[in-house]
């Protein structure tokens, strides 16, 4: 499923993560690339857009992100739930007949517009960012601060700075990891009004 992409203003970039979706983190360094699933990411600042993502010490994606100083967050949807689960369960250091995860699982990708990071086709949003190094926090908590430098989303589900989760686009709904290979989907978007 090839996605439609539209730029998201950086002022709205954090809105892509405020509902707590599972993300696929991708990174590249000196021609080596990898991706992994991460359940824990959140906005921490809106201007400039900064997020926090947890990357376990044992992961190859973390190693590449540290070496390059940048990473990307790809927001997968229900249409690619099996791929999302699989890339989170396979170690990127274990090559399959010399193939990296992108090649092994036939993951189509495209270059990010600012940092040239590998972004995953079939997702519904993409963010590129530079690491804001905090070694003590990284080593103690596996938490990484990232300043977002580019954001894109599929306008069929995210437009004008807002998510639009409706039954008609359920194959585009983001994934929310519940553990042990189970995921939840947002079922609808509702609008609140302020009480007087």
Sequence positions of predicted segments:
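Basic, polyanion-binding surface patches
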Residues: 1-196
């Amino acid at each position: 499923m090839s996605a439609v992409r539209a730029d998201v203003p950086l002022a709205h970039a954090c809105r892509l993560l405020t509902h707590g979706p599972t993300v696929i983190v991708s990174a590249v360094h000196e021609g080596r690339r990898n991706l992994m699933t991460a359940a824990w990411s959140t906005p921490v600042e809106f201007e400039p857009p900064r997020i926090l993502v947890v990357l376990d010490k044992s992961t190859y994606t973390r190693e590449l992100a540290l070496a390059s100083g940048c990473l990307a967050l790809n927001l997968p949807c229900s249409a690619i739930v099996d791929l999302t689960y699989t890339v989170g369960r396979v170690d990127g250091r274990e090559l399959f007949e010399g193939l990296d995860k992108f090649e092994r699982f036939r993951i189509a990708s495209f270059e990010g517009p600012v940092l040239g990071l590998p972004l995953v086709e079939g997702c519904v949003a993409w963010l590129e960012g530079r690491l804001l190094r905090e070694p003590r926090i990284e080593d103690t908590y596996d938490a990484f601060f990232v300043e977002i430098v580019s954001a894109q989303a599929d306008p069929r589900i995210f437009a004008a700075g807002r998510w639009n989760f409706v039954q008609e686009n359920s194959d585009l709904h983001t994934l929310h990891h519940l553990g042990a290979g189970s995921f939840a989907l947002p079922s609808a978007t509702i609008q609140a009004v302020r009480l007087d």
